[in-house]
UniProtKB/Swiss-Prot annotation:
Subcellular localization(s) per the UniProt record: Cytoplasm
Signal sequence bounds: none
Binding site for (S)-2,3,4,5-tetrahydrodipicolinate: H133, G142, T143
EC numbers, comma separated: 1.17.1.8
Protein name: 4-hydroxy-tetrahydrodipicolinate reductase
Gene Ontology terms, MF aspect: 4-hydroxy-tetrahydrodipicolinate reductase; NAD binding; NADP binding; oxidoreductase activity, acting on CH or CH2 groups, NAD or NADP as acceptor
Gene Ontology BP term (one): diaminopimelate biosynthetic process
PROSITE patterns: DAPB
Main subcellular location of this protein, as a coarse class: cytoplasm
Disulfide bonds, paired cysteine numbers: none
InterPro entries: DapB_C, DapB_N, DapB_N_CS, DHDPR_bac, NAD(P)-bd_dom_sf
Residue positions binding NAD(+): G7, A8, R9, G10, K11, V12, G75, T76, T77, A102, P103, N104, F105
Pathway recorded for this protein: Amino-acid biosynthesis; L-lysine biosynthesis via DAP pathway; (S)-tetrahydrodipicolinate from L-aspartate: step 4/4
Amino acid sequence: MRVGVLGARGKVGATMVAAVEAAEDLTFSAGVDAGDDLSLLTESKTEVVIDFTHPDVVMDNLKFVIDNGIHAVVGTTGFTWERIEQVEAWVKAKPGASVLIAPNFAIGAVLSMHFAKQAAKYFESVEIIELHHPHKADAPSGTAARTAKLIAEARKGLPPNPDATSTGLDGARGADVDGIPVHSVRLAGLVAHQEVLFGTQGETLTIRHDSLDRTSFVPGVLLAVRKISGLQGLTVGIEPLLDLS
């Protein structure tokens, strides 16, 4: 399988280039970065692209690869539901290409989201703290937003978080994502980390995941690359590729 990388000279992109080159069953076909022409992908007969670029350019990248029948595995951040709906419309109009967009490709992060969803209905309170390097473009992270959505779905019909706060500085209680408080930390020395804190009478539960370096994303990305040709249309998250039942 011929695999290209968009954002190939970035920190995550360079990690993906090395991973593809090291995989015996994959061929690195093209590395594309800012200033390069996307036609490099078609000229190199790329079959699947890995996109770790920037929210400002990822939609243009996806339009190009979908129009050219190239599958896409996307780890770029900043996907709103409006953007996801737009990508879904594009792939429906061009059924030859499949797209997988994931807020996080680290297997441990995906499992932590799954565990949080399972725990959500058993606790009165829940809050999320996500911690990343200071160069991250979006806040809260896509992983935190996805986690909050999964928790909110699991807590349907339950009372909201108890919170007697009546005065305070704007933002002190975090962002409200589907009724779940989410707190974002940006700090030099961090990579990608998340804590989900649950509380109820007499006990708390903390689910924490840490990506210590960017190679933590490699197994999930390569799994998606190898599976994407068997998927149809748009897939959000790598959960469908894992046996989480």
